[in-house]
């Protein structure tokens, strides 16, 4: 690991707004943000108290109406956390958490949040697969998935963050009317997600295959990430979907999905990307 990465990993261990694989946090995020807003002292996560002796109430003692009125939004596979930070600036009365495994990327967003005094923005270093360990049932209001790896190979479709395997995971902590947002430059991931929504009869709120050509764009969609700027898919279009996971996703349909997604085509840019990835993997071998 390079020296710069080591420095960033060491830094986030000292940041109050970054938790790494946190334990015993289900239902306690309102208390955590309350502690974060009280000052810069080290937060003792195990008891949700501040080490200088100041008391921060457990989630059970927080006014339930206040807790319920503070929406909690996750940015999954957040990378540098542009969305968590951007949304935190837009909505200072709400709470935002970016989740990613790569600490050197999280460092960027966490550093900006600290510098700008955004006490409503935090980060969790973890695999997405573990998120149900960190949030209680119906604790999360919205999920943003922005420019994730589209996992172009058919054999890796289960790794796509809108695959039913992941939607079942999100359903464990997302509110019944909670919204999932997907923003991507990958036509394949966009069409795959629409296929999932259709097959499992989920509630589609909004879709567009050319976001910036739309009238009256949601200001939240104007936040741009580092990966959007790269335009890896070379599609020249940004695709966007809003939907609810408003019903159970039968496992029996997974096999049907497995067969139907074979017919979803890739555009030229995605084919080039897949060829480049294959060449890189071969070189590494």
Question: What is the predicted role of each segment?
Answer:
Residues 109:
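Conserved SAM-binding loop
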Residues 162-176:
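A short glycine-rich, Lys/Arg-flanked "PGG" loop and its adjoining helix->strand segment in the class I
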Residues 1-65, 208-285:
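SAM/dcSAM-binding transferase cores
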Residues 102:
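Conserved SAM/SAH-binding beta-strand->alpha-helix loop
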Residues 133-142, 147:
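A short acidic, Gly/Pro-enriched loop at the edge of an enzyme's catalytic core
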Residues 112-137:
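S-adenosyl-L-methionine
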Residues 77-81:
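Class I SAM-dependent methyltransferase "Motif I" SAM/SAH-binding loop
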């Amino acid at each position: 690991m390079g020296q710069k990465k080591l420095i960033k990993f060491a830094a986030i261990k000292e940041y109050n707004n970054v938790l790494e694989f946190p334990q015993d946090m289900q239902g306690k995020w309102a208390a955590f943000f309350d502690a974060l807003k009280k000052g810069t002292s080290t937060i003792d996560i195990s008891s949700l108290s501040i080490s200088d002796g100041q008391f921060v109430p457990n989630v059970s003692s927080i006014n339930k109406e206040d807790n319920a009125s503070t929406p909690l939004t996750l940015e999954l596979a957040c990378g540098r956390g542009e969305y968590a930070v951007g949304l935190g600036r837009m909505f200072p009365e709400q709470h935002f958490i970016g989740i990613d495994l790569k600490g050197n990327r999280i460092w960027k967003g966490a550093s900006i949040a600290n510098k700008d005094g955004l006490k409503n923005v935090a980060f969790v270093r973890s695999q997405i697969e573990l998120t149900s360990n960190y949030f209680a049932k119906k604790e999360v209001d919205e999920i943003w998935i922005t420019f994730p790896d589209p996992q172009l190979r058919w054999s890796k479709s289960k790794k796509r963050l809108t695959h039913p395997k992941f939607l079942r995971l999100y359903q464990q902590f997302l509110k019944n009317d909670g919204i999932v947002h997907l923003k991507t430059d990958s036509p394949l991931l966009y069409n795959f997600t629409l296929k999932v929504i259709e097959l499992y009869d989920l509630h589609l709120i909004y879709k567009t295959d050319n976001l910036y050509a739309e009238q009256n764009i949601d200001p939240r969609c104007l936040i741009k990430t580092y990966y959007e700027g790269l335009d890896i898919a070379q599609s020249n279009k940004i695709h966007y979907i809003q939907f609810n996971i408003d019903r159970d996703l039968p496992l029996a349909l997974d096999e049907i999905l497995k067969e139907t997604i074979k017919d979803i085509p890739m555009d030229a840019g995605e084919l080039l990307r897949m060829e480049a990835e294959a060449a890189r993997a071969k070189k590494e071998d």
